[in-house]
C-alpha cells in the first residue's frame, strides 16, 4: 500500500508540475498581447483589402493584351504598353447594389476594428493610464474589445462573401453567351476572408484572456488561508461535555 500511495503522489506531483509549466507559458497577459497582435493584423489586412482594386479580375481570350481589375472604389485596366490606369466610379446611383453594401460593411469593419484596438489598449495588464484602472474596468474593456473584433470580422466576411456570391451567379449566368468574358475572383477576395477570420480569432482570444484572468483570481482566492479559528470553549461547557 505504501508503494502505491507513493506512486500516486509522484504522479500527482508530476501533473501539477506540468500544469504549472503550461500556465507559465500561457498566462492571461500573454494571451492579451496575442489577441491585440492578431486583431491589429486583421485590421491592417482589412484596411488594405477595402481600397485595393483587386476584388474581381477579367481577361478574355479575344483580347489577351488587356486585363481588367475591379474593386469597391475603382476600376482599372492593365496593358503592356501603357501600364495600369484606374478610374473611380462616377456616382453612387450607378453603382451595383452588392458593391454599395460591401462598401458600407467594409467601412464598418475598419471602424469597429480600430475601435477594438483602442479600447483594448487601456485594458491590458501592465498598462496604467492616469490614476490607474481597476481590474473590473480592465475586464470590461477587454470584453468590449472582443465584441468589437467579432463585429469587425463578421462584417468583413459578409462583405467579401456578398461580392463572391454575386460574382459566381453572374459567372454561371446562362443568358450570357459563352464568348462574353466574365468576372472572376481577385486576390482581395481571399485577403478579405483571411482578415475577417483574423479579427474573429482576435476577439475570441480576448474572451479567452478574460476567462484565464478570472481563473487566476479564483485560484489566488482559494489559496488564501480563510479557515476561521475555533473559539476557546468555556470551562462550564467543557464540564457539561465531560458529564
Q: Where are the regions that the model predicts?
A:
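A surface-exposed beta-alpha-beta supersecondary segment
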Residues: 52-103
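Alpha-helical membrane-embedding segments
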Residues: 92-103, 167-170, 204-217
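Alpha-helical transmembrane segments of multi-pass membrane proteins
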Residues: 35-47, 103-120, 139-167, 188-203
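Juxtamembrane membrane-interface segments at transmembrane-helix boundaries in membrane proteins
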Residues: 20-29, 83-104, 136-139, 175-190
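Hydrophobic alpha-helical transmembrane segments
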Residues: 45-54, 89-100, 134-148
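Amphipathic alpha-helical interface segments within eukaryotic helical scaffold
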Residues: 86-132
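Juxtamembrane loop segments immediately following a transmembrane helix
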Residues: 128-134, 157-190
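Intrinsically disordered terminal tails
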Residues: 1-43, 48-64, 70, 128-138, ...
Amino acid at each position: 500500500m505504501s508503494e502505491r500511495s507513493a506512486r500516486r503522489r509522484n504522479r500527482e506531483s508530476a501533473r501539477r508540475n506540468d500544469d504549472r509549466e503550461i500556465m507559465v507559458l500561457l498566462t492571461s497577459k500573454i494571451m492579451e498581447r496575442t489577441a491585440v497582435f492578431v486583431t491589429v493584423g486583421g485590421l491592417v489586412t482589412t484596411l488594405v483589402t477595402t481600397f485595393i482594386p483587386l476584388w474581381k479580375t477579367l481577361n478574355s481570350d479575344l483580347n489577351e493584351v488587356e486585363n481588367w481589375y475591379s474593386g469597391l472604389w475603382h476600376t482599372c485596366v492593365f496593358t503592356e504598353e501603357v501600364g495600369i490606369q484606374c478610374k473611380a466610379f462616377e456616382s453612387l446611383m450607378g453603382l451595383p447594389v452588392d458593391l454599395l453594401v460591401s462598401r458600407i460593411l467594409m467601412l464598418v469593419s475598419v471602424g469597429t476594428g480600430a475601435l477594438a484596438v483602442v479600447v483594448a489598449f487601456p485594458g491590458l495588464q501592465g498598462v496604467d493610464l492616469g490614476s490607474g484602472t481597476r481590474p473590473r474596468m480592465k475586464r470590461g474593456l477587454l470584453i468590449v474589445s472582443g465584441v468589437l473584433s467579432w463585429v469587425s470580422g463578421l462584417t468583413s466576411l459578409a462583405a467579401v462573401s456578398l461580392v463572391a456570391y454575386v460574382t459566381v451567379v453572374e459567372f454561371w449566368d446562362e443568358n450570357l453567351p459563352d464568348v462574353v468574358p466574365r468576372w472572376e475572383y481577385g486576390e482581395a477576395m481571399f485577403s478579405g476572408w483571411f482578415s475577417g477570420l483574423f479579427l474573429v480569432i482576435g476577439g475570441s482570444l480576448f474572451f479567452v484572456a478574460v476567462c484565464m484572468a478570472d481563473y487566476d483570481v479564483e485560484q489566488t482566492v482559494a489559496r488564501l488561508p480563510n479557515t476561521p479559528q475555533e473559539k476557546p470553549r468555556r470551562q462550564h461547557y467543557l464540564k457539561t461535555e465531560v458529564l
